[in-house]
């Protein structure tokens, strides 16, 4: 049952006035450019408005006749809404974490859980329904029943149908169409803007699986942002912006994996292939003659040829230990490496430890979300945990080592190892994919190539072949509409 228009109209208008609803041109986390942007986070600083929104959400649940024992807000914007609802109406609340903490109870759901009881999910905005489903799945794993979700605004992009296909009824206080109608009547927006928003919504609907179990029709891909455009996004890390700009300028998304054992060869590779690459990946612990002077020379070459240095250290210990490994010891990695990487197995402490050293030096980190070796355990929930950790520490983490795109946020970079011009593998379990497969089909940004170049008779010629193949795959991906 819809909320009475006399209550809805003033609420929509006030939300517009406090800039919860914005119109213009905005880049969404999917990379799409949208004429409307909805951001309700600011209402936490407006207690009266926060209470109004919470009350209208609760009334919507009552009007729908929903029976429930507890309430859980989708993190993070819906958490304060759920808190106000539960406090005002004396209802038990559950809090869902985005990731398990490495201390305390280590639980994903906090609060008194009674398996078999029904939990009502609260959300601020629904687009595809994915965030609601993630919360539903976590609650169901705790033995709770979830049948309904209440949302303030349904963007009408397929989320309701997607949730319905999973047995979840979505009840919206307001739809995007209703919001547009109210704001146009109040002369907050004109007919042209209403038309632009409606066209955008119609062209970007997320399809749910059919009830007969068949997969949804293939959705037409939308043109994504170029490297240059991604560099200018307000949420892009400064070092990621630098990398994206030099990639655009040099027309290269090739990272050379310089796994050599002699410093002289490392420097020769950097000098000869520097113009063809955007990054040079090192394994300094395999250099027989490592010195900090060598790294000083490498840093000078990186500056001359405009590429970044990525030390493939794969940190995987507790925070205090990785901090020391990064900052001191024989290699003093933080003093010369622009970027390092880390496993997520130890929990967020590994990032926090690296961050304490790297942030003041304007360094950055990649998280290992997937690996190119046969039998890798970096899949499924492990990959999801890596994405969640990156989002939580985006001031230091700039992306992932992965076999494909694992996050739709254009601010994050994806680097893929195990690339050769021909697919295949080696006797130690390394699996190879082509640049077209990795960049064009799997949505990665940068290919990491080692043996395909190092084993070639003419390394510069081989590097140029990989550079061109990867860049052409990127351009082809941009051209898809």
Swiss-Prot record:
Matches recorded under InterPro entries: Aldolase_TIM (IPR013785), OMPdecase (IPR014732), OMPdecase_AS (IPR018089), OMPdeCOase_dom (IPR001754), OPRT (IPR023031), Or_phspho_trans_dom (IPR004467), PRibTrfase_dom (IPR000836), PRTase-like (IPR029057)
This protein's name: Uridine 5'-monophosphate synthase
Pfam families: OMPdecase, Pribosyltran
Family label: In the N-terminal section; belongs to the purine/pyrimidine phosphoribosyltransferase family.
Region (OMPdecase): 221-481
Disulfide bonds: none
Ranges in a coiled coil: none
Known EC number: 2.4.2.10, 4.1.1.23
């Amino acid at each position: 049952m819809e909320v009475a228009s006399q209550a809805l109209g003033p609420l929509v208008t006030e939300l517009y006035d406090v800039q919860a609803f914005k119109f213009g041109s905005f880049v969404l986390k999917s990379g799409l450019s949208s004429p409307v942007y909805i951001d309700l986070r600011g209402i936490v600083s407006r207690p009266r408005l926060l209470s109004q929104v919470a009350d209208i959400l609760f009334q919507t649940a009552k009007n729908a006749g929903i029976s429930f024992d507890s309430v859980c807000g989708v993190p993070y914007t819906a958490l304060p809404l759920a808190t106000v609802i539960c406090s005002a109406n004396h209802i038990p609340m559950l809090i869902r974490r985005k990731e398990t903490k490495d201390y305390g109870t280590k639980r994903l759901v906090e609060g008194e859980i009674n398996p078999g009881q029904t939990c009502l999910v609260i959300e601020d905005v629904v687009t595809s329904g994915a965030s609601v489903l993630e919360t539903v799945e976590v609650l169901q794993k705790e033995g709770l029943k979830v049948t309904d979700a209440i949302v303030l605004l349904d963007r009408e992009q397929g989320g309701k149908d997607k949730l319905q296909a999973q047995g979840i009824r979505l009840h919206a206080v307001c739809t995007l169409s209703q919001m547009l109608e109210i704001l146009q009547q109040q002369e907050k927006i004109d007919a042209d803007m209403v038309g632009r928003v409606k066209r955008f919504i119609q062209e970007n609907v997320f399809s749910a699986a059919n009830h007969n179990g068949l997969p949804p029709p293939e959705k037409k891909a939308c043109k994504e942002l170029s490297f240059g455009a991604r560099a200018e996004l307000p949420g892009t890390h400064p070092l990621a912006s630098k990398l994206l700009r030099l990639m655009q300028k040099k027309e290269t998304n090739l990272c050379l994996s310089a796994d050599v054992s002699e410093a002289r060869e490392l420097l020769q590779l950097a000098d000869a292939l520097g113009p063809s690459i955007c990054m040079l990946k090192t394994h300094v612990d395999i250099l027989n003659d490592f010195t900090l002077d060598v790294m000083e020379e490498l840093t000078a070459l990186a500056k001359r040829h405009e590429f970044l240095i990525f030390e493939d250290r794969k940190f995987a210990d507790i925070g205090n230990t990785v901090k020391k490994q990064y900052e001191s010891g024989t290699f003093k990695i933080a003093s010369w490496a622009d970027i390092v990487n880390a496993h997520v197995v130890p929990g967020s402490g590994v990032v926090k430890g690296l961050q304490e050293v790297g942030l003041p030096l304007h360094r950055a980190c990649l998280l290992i979300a997937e690996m190119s070796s046969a039998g890798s355990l970096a899949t499924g929930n492990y990959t999801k945990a890596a994405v969640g950790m990156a989002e939580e520490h985006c001031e230091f983490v700039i992306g992932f080592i992965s076999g494909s795109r694992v996050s739709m946020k254009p601010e994050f970079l994806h680097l893929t190892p195990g690339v050769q011009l021909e697919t295949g593998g080696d006797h130690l379990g390394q699996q190879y994919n082509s640049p077209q497969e990795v960049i064009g089909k799997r949505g990665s940004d940068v290919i990491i190539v080692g043996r395909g170049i190092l084993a070639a008779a003419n390394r510069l010629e081989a590097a140029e072949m990989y550079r061109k193949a990867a860049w052409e795959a990127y351009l082809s991906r941009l051209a898809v509409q």
